[in-house]
Amino acid sequence: MAKKTIKVTQTRSSIGRLPKHKATLRGLGLRRIGHTVELEDTAAVRGMVNRVNYMIKVEG
């Protein structure tokens, strides 16, 4: 069975954000507005998504 994945898209800029939030975006592999990455749906990734949920959109 294939592992479940989620698509994460950055919708807002990281300029002026907390350093931890910028680092979280980098950890998710996001670099710029409109950038989309497909990530494995794990507890660690979900925690990162929850930290920066105001800057991203999640599908799947």
Swiss-Prot record:
PANTHER family: LARGE RIBOSOMAL SUBUNIT PROTEIN UL30M (PTHR15892:SF2), MITOCHONDRIAL RIBOSOMAL PROTEIN L30 (PTHR15892). It comes from the Bacteria. Part of the 50S ribosomal subunit. The keyword Hydrolase does not apply. One of its GO terms (cellular component) is cytosolic large ribosomal subunit. The gene is rpmD. Belongs to the universal ribosomal protein uL30 family. This is Large ribosomal subunit protein uL30. The keyword RNA-binding does not apply. It comes from Idiomarina loihiensis (strain ATCC BAA-735 / DSM 15497 / L2-TR). SUPFAM superfamilies: Ribosomal protein L30p/L7e. Keywords: Ribonucleoprotein, Ribosomal protein. Signal peptide: none annotated. It holds the Pfam family Ribosomal_L30.
